[in-house]
Amino acid sequence: MSVTDKFKQFLVNIKVQNDAQIELRYGEITAALNKEFRDSESKTANNLQVGSYGRWTAIKGVSDLDMLYIVPSSQWDKYKDGGQYALLDRTKKAMKDRYPRTEVFVDRLVVRVLYKDFHVEVQPVFELTDNSFRYPDSYNGGSWKNTKPRAEIAAMTEFVGEKNKNLRRLCKMARAWKNKHGVGMGGLLIDTLAHNFLRD
């Protein structure tokens, strides 16, 4: 077996195995929140998968998943002045009402939904005109912060095309190494270092 074939097999071995289950959970969460905020049960509208899974750099055994739920802009006035925790709590209750046996709780910036094999961190957000998002931080009385995941995902996708998909491959291999050796390094840092390495 050539070195190329060994790397190909390595990437097959670390590929996410439970995509269908992950997508099912994302859909369930989205439907619960669409029902609460929009009286709709769409499993796909108004969410954005972020984190390593959203950037396509996750590997087999991924245990923490991240998503944004885009709250209708009509709700902004209700929460803008000190309503950060209230928005997170409403998000939690909507999921808890729909799935009462699942552990769901507010954790400062997100609502954590704990499933048997992985957990999902759900962040309710308001979309801004520049395609960024405003999200609640419930710490110390509450504040609003901004994030630009669409720009990050677009930059990753563009760079992946320029580098013949090697960026995502390198990110996945680095994650496997990190997991194997217990290195304390976050996924975004891995992706950033891999991006910078291939860029330079």
Go through the PLM ranges and name each one.
Residues E28-S40, R90-R98, M173, W177:
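Generic non-transmembrane alpha-helical segments
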